[in-house]
Amino acid sequence: MRVKNAVNSKKKKKKILKFVKGFRGALRRRYSLAKQSYYRALKFAFDGRRNKKGNFRKIWITRINIAARNAGLKYNELIHGLKLANVAINRKMLAELAVNDPESFKEYVNIAKAALGK
């Protein structure tokens, strides 16, 4: 007697069709296309989680650069000056200070200027 494993295959199909419920057209109705779009969506989600880290870093650098230029330094000069002064602060914290606490950010700029000799 041949066993087709109907319960598990039905469960698998149900899971995928539930996931693609909001998709359009045949991607939602036909199992073979739904499966492809399901795996494609998971791939995009995986890639997005990886790209998010770089995107946030770009945003932080842009915010720091704007605030540093308002204080009279370029971004790369600020970072180099902080490294020369042995100040260990990451870009996320610098960006937070630049947006939410400009006075303390100016202190870091002054430390960097002193280390650079400006």
UniProtKB/Swiss-Prot annotation:
SUPFAM superfamilies: Ribosomal protein L20. Pfam families: Ribosomal_L20 (PF00453). Keywords: Ribonucleoprotein, Ribosomal protein, RNA-binding, rRNA-binding. One of its GO terms (molecular function) is rRNA binding. Binds directly to 23S ribosomal RNA and is necessary for the in vitro assembly process of the 50S ribosomal subunit. It is not involved in the protein synthesizing functions of that subunit. Belongs to the bacterial ribosomal protein bL20 family. This is Large ribosomal subunit protein bL20.
